[in-house]
């Protein structure tokens, strides 16, 4: 894999690292079709799938179920190369906009939603708590041991770039990646164009 922006949020998609990651994706894509979310969850639940990469909120393992969680390995070799995190965190952020008309009420809501009591209660409804205390609570882990794995992934994972233009960024890059997959552009053509468009977006 590779970063799509550098430390200054300058796009870095027309690079050898991104091209290598894209080629790896193409090789995987050629092995078979992908499933949508509901089909992935159904195949995991039924035990038909040997391995699936999913968001924790999609599937809750049970004691007698056919599947369980494991953290994606951070390294597959035993050489001396540095260990890089490979788990990607989806960024679900809650905040109060500057132009919010009722900031005091919004703050009260946030304090309620983020309270330990509400976060613990969310687990019983297949929620994934965002409080460390909930993910490491020994009583919780007795019933929901998979949350220990979730916590481990959160500790070793990396977050998407924190950029205001993320939606537009992924639309531009995703369109050009699809052009590569469909064969309407070469990888060099598509990524050079994506780089140009993304640089304009981030300027």
Give the ranges of each region predicted by the language model.
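Short, well-structured alpha-helical segments that form the helix of a local strand-helix-strand
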Residues: 44, 187-198
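Soluble non-cytosolic domains of exported or imported proteins
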Residues: 12-19, 38, 100, 104, ...
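Periplasmic solute-binding protein
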Residues: 1-8, 88-97, 169-178
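Long, aromatic- and glycine/proline-rich binding clefts that accommodate carbohydrate-like moieties
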Residues: 74, 123-175, 179
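Short helix-initiation/N-cap motifs at beta->coil->alpha
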Residues: 34-46
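Paired acidic/hydrophobic, glycine-rich loop segments that form the ligand-binding mouth/hinge
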Residues: 50-55, 70
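Extracytoplasmic/periplasmic substrate-recognition and gating elements
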Residues: 30-34, 63-128, 184-185
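Glycine-centered hinge/linker elements that transmit conformational signals in sensory
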Residues: 7-37
């Amino acid at each position: 894999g590779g970063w799509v922006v550098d430390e200054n949020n300058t796009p870095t998609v027309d690079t050898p690292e991104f091209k290598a990651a894209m080629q790896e994706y193409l090789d995987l894509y050629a092995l078979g079709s992908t499933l949508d979310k509901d089909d992935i969850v159904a195949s995991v639940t039924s035990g038909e799938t040997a391995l699936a990469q999913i968001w924790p909120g999609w599937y809750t393992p049970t004691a007698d179920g056919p599947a369980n969680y494991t953290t994606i390995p951070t390294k597959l070799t035993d050489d001396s190369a540095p260990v890089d995190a490979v788990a990607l965190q989806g960024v679900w952020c809650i905040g109060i906009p500057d132009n919010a008309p009722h900031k005091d009420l919004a703050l009260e809501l946030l304090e309620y939603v983020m309270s330990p009591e509400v976060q613990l209660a969310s687990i019983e409804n297949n929620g994934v708590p965002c409080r460390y205390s909930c993910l490491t609570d020994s009583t919780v882990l007795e019933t929901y041991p998979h949350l220990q794995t979730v916590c481990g992934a959160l500790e070793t994972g990396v977050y998407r770039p924190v950029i205001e233009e993320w939606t537009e960024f992924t639309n531009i890059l995703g369109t050009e990646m699809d052009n590569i997959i469909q064969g309407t552009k070469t990888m060099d053509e598509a990524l050079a164009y994506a780089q140009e468009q993304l640089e304009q977006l981030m300027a």
